[in-house]
UniProtKB/Swiss-Prot annotation:
Residues 183-253 are annotated as: Small ATPAse domain (RuvB-S). This is Holliday junction branch migration complex subunit RuvB. One of its GO terms (cellular component) is cytoplasm. GO terms for molecular function: ATP binding; ATP hydrolysis activity; four-way junction DNA binding; four-way junction helicase activity. ATP binds at residues 21-22, 63, 66-68, 129-131, 172, 182, 219. Homohexamer. Forms an RuvA(8)-RuvB(12)-Holliday junction (HJ) complex. HJ DNA is sandwiched between 2 RuvA tetramers; dsDNA enters through RuvA and exits via RuvB. An RuvB hexamer assembles on each DNA strand where it exits the tetramer. Each RuvB hexamer is contacted by two RuvA subunits (via domain III) on 2 adjacent RuvB subunits; this complex drives branch migration. In the full resolvosome a probable DNA-RuvA(4)-RuvB(12)-RuvC(2) complex forms which resolves the HJ. It is found in: Cytoplasm. It holds the Pfam family RuvB_C. It catalyses: ATP + H2O = ADP + phosphate + H(+). Its main location: cytoplasm. The RuvA-RuvB-RuvC complex processes Holliday junction (HJ) DNA during genetic recombination and DNA repair, while the RuvA-RuvB complex plays an important role in the rescue of blocked DNA replication forks via replication fork reversal (RFR). RuvA specifically binds to HJ cruciform DNA, conferring on it an open structure. The RuvB hexamer acts as an ATP-dependent pump, pulling dsDNA into and through the RuvAB complex. RuvB forms 2 homohexamers on either side of HJ DNA bound by 1 or 2 RuvA tetramers; 4 subunits per hexamer contact DNA at a time.
Length: 341
């Protein structure tokens, strides 16, 4: 989105900074209390039995800690960690090369697992159930199937689009776990920890200001923290205060709800061009010059969570809160009757 500040998009941080700011254990991990409590039980049980932990699926919006939790699982299980992604595994041989090199009880993390090709997914089924690979050698009448035994391992899948997973693949995960947006209090702790690790002095009000505008997402909180620290060093005395945080984030185009220029463009489009909706997702994506997936995965989850938009069978509609946020008056037409009376 051309008018959107990339600071607010939950793409990954540079690897060195990303790794430095990540918690290294479940004890350090802030938020996702229910998921952490359950994972602690499953990890301890696997360690006591000396077996591979059951296959685990993390799903939810991007930037909530799916990769971090997978790394923590491997660390607390005391086993190796291998990481890949669905689009990278283009053919069965790619998957076979990884699986045959796993040590006993290792954790294999597949990001964007909903993007696995069907042919690779078919090879994965026996690997998950029987720890074996069934590969076809040769072609035509001379083709034969060879079974390769694998070491027991734990597959951790991550997806932002649970609905795109096939039912057979989804059913093979014994531990499905949904990650939720973080509270402001949780993000404040995360930002304060990040500031300490960066060697930056901070005021509670300053870290809270960043947390308030981080869209419930730790990855965005970390990115905003780095930008605010830049302003604190160049235009302040190096201390992260509420005033410098507010000034920096305002200049970055982040409002008090955490919406950026792209979010406000989305809301304004529906308000000004379509009278508040309903309007179809394909129309919205075309008008914004964005891919439909980008709109559904990146922009809409937080707007829905904040109660700014509503998904209906006829399309997207603005909620009353969105009209107030835009400083506009909601129309009283029949299309809005169900939302505004």
């Amino acid at each position: 989105m051309t008018s959107s500040d990339p600071t607010l998009r939950p793409e990954r941080l540079p690897e060195d900074m990303d790794r430095a700011l990540r918690p290294q254990s479940l004890e350090e991990f802030v938020g996702q209390a229910e998921a952490r409590a359950n994972l602690r039980v499953f990890i301890e049980s696997a360690r006591m039995r000396g077996e591979a932990m059951d296959h685990t699926l993390f799903h939810g919006p991007p930037g909530l800690g799916k990769t971090t939790l997978a790394q923590i699982m491997a660390r607390e299980l005391g086993v190796g960690f291998r990481m890949t992604s669905g689009p990278v595994l283009a053919k069965p041989g790619d998957l076979a090369a990884i699986l045959t090199n796993l040590e006993p009880r290792d954790v294999l993390f597949i990001d964007e697992i909903h993007r696995l090709s069907p042919v690779v997914e078919e090879v994965l089924y026996p690997a998950l159930e029987d720890f074996a690979l069934d590969l076809v050698i040769g072609e035509g009448p001379a083709a034969r199937t060879v079974r390769i035994e694998l070491q027991p391992f734990t597959l951790v899948g991550a997806t932002t689009r649970l609905g795109l997973l096939t039912t057979p693949l989804r059913d093979r995960f014994g531990i499905p776990t949904r990650l939720q947006f973080y509270t402001e209090a949780e993000l404040t702790l995360i930002v304060a920890r990040g500031a300490r690790m960066m060697g930056v002095d901070s005021d509670p009000e300053g870290t809270q200001e960043i947390a308030r505008r981080a869209r419930g997402t730790p990855r965005i909180a970390g990115r905003l923290l780095r930008r605010v620290v830049d302003f604190a060093l160049v235009e302040g005395d190096g201390r992260l205060t509420q005033a410098i945080a507010d000034r920096a984030l305002t200049r970055l185009g982040v409002d008090h709800l955490g919406l950026d220029l792209g979010d406000r463009r989305y809301l304004s489009l529906i308000a000004e061009n379509y009278g508040g909706g309903p309007v179809g997702i394909e129309t919205i994506a075309a008008a914004l010059s964005e891919a439909r997936d980008a709109v559904e995965e990146v922009i809409e989850p937080y707007l829905l969570q904040q109660g700014l938009i509503q998904r209906t069978p006829r399309g997207r509609m603005l909620a009353h809160k969105a009209w107030r946020h835009l400083g506009l008056e909601a129309p009283k037409g029949p299309g809005q009757a169900d939302l505004f009376g």
